[in-house]
Amino acid sequence: PSKPVQWVFTGVCLLIVLLGFLFPFSQLVYWAIKTAHKVIDASFGMIVVKSFSLAAGSSVLIVFMAIVLLYAVRVSGMHGMRYVTRIASLGYAIPGAVIAVGIMAPVIGFDKWLLRVAPLDGKLLLSSGLFMLLFAYLVRFMAVGYNAIDTGFQKAGKDINDASRMLGFNTWHTLWKVDLPLIRKSIAAALLSVFVDVIKELPLTLILRPFNFHTLATKAFDMATNEQIAESANASLIVILTGILPVVLLNRIIRKSH
């Protein structure tokens, strides 16, 4: 195409970036700077710590479960096992609110039964803490960790696994000494991907969070609901930056792997 046509296409692409990201992001930065003295305090710092701790814990749990499931398939050699484990990763296609409602009924029912069997000062042990929320994250984001780890195992292949077994290493020693080092980039990618998804997840957290428990996403939502649009920019900005930085790291991991 001619130079004018190239400039037109370049301008259209830049316009999309400007309207879709740079202008809204600049507005958020302006609001965040303007309202920082009213919003950022010790309680806001605790919300940041809780959000990052919850996301980190959920990431480790989900990636651990993905490794266990996929290694069970890898060791068993049964093709049917792969279809069974795939069921565990269907939650990503289901809306968060639906998962939340679906989890609440059985967990609360089990909690009430547990209360009758072993009374614990009248407290609902599982549904009053973070258990339901962590379990919901596990159901919702298992596919993210599962697919990343599955890719790593497929790239590693099974030949080196078989060679390790022939040299006398047992199953778990092979996993620890051979497989995990080979898929460490996939593990890092899975951890980062799940971390970002948990940080920005709203419906699940709103429905299943314990009383008076806030994350950055719920804090931004509450402020926006109360017409504190400018004040919500601080939490929103942290969520956005938390989503951007891992993407940059993931791109570096992918480039190095190629």
Question: Where are each of the predicted segments found?
Answer:
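C-terminal transmembrane helix and the adjacent membrane-cytosol boundary/short C-terminal tail
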Residues: 1, 71-80, 150-161, 165, ...
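Transmembrane alpha-helices
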Residues: 9-19, 90, 139, 146-149, ...
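Membrane-interfacial helix termini and adjacent extracytoplasmic/periplasmic loops
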Residues: 1, 40-45, 80-81, 100-138, ...
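Hydrophobic alpha-helical transmembrane segments of polytopic membrane proteins
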Residues: 57-66, 132-136, 140, 144, ...
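Cytoplasmic-entry segments and transmembrane alpha-helices of multi-pass inner-membrane transporters
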Residues: 6-10, 68-107, 161
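Membrane-cytosol interface at the C-terminal ends of specific transmembrane alpha-helices
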Residues: 126-165, 190-191
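Periplasmic/extracellular loop-to-transmembrane helix junction in inner-membrane transport proteins
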Residues: 1-7, 25-61, 76-78, 226-227
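Interhelical loop and adjacent transmembrane-helix boundary motif
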Residues: 2-6, 31-42, 199, 205-248
